[in-house]
Amino acid sequence: MKKTRLQKVLARAGFGSRRGCEEIISSGKVTVNGEIAKLGCSVDADDEIKLGGKTVEFVDIQTRLFVLNKPAGVICSKKTEGNLKSIYDLLPKIDNEKNLIIVGRLDANSSGLIFFTNDGKLSEFIAHPSNLFDREYLVRARGNFNDEIKENMLTGIKIDSQLLRLSDIIAGDKTSSNRWYTVCLLTGRNREIRKIFESQGLQVSRLKRVRFGPIFLPKGLKEGGWAELKSKDLEKMYSYGK
């Protein structure tokens, strides 16, 4: 059986990012077959792995991560609604495709980068707020924008008992009554960007996610198209999480 780096096994088991798991190993809290593990060691399912005296499950799966360019008018649900198609209709034809997990849902009117994976631990790792995966969007909106509005968006606006804020916003040139913005945020609440803009009198007409953490929407990937990410991209994801 092919051996796997210990930090990868710990990350798959839900003990944090690869970087965080490396620190756990270096602390001397992990044992393999009764001996204190060294950073860089590899293990397989026959090895007894313990963290703080508790057994760590060896998850032996081939992690797959797909990026899909979601079109507007498609919902992130297995069920269709009216004339709206399901994002699952666009999935790659692989074994157990219906068991792929959505990571980074977008509302029906938004488009752009969405992840799918067969690894539940990876999906939890990417989605967990503590790992600080920032998201970048292109937003087209109608209305007047000024420094005061920008400051409001960055410091936070209380909406529906929640403090919503952007981590960055760059305003582009204005064309007629519309303007394009490059927007970043660290959370993924439902319709968060739209709510922030609308609270400041700006009406969003287009919203497209172009980056999630270290992964950009691939150039040339058509709407409705997908691509499987390589192992080096998986390493980027695990290393990116704080």
Where are these regions (language model features)?
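Basic, flexible Lys/Arg- and Gly-enriched helix-loop patches that mediate nucleic-acid binding at interfaces
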Residues: M1-K242
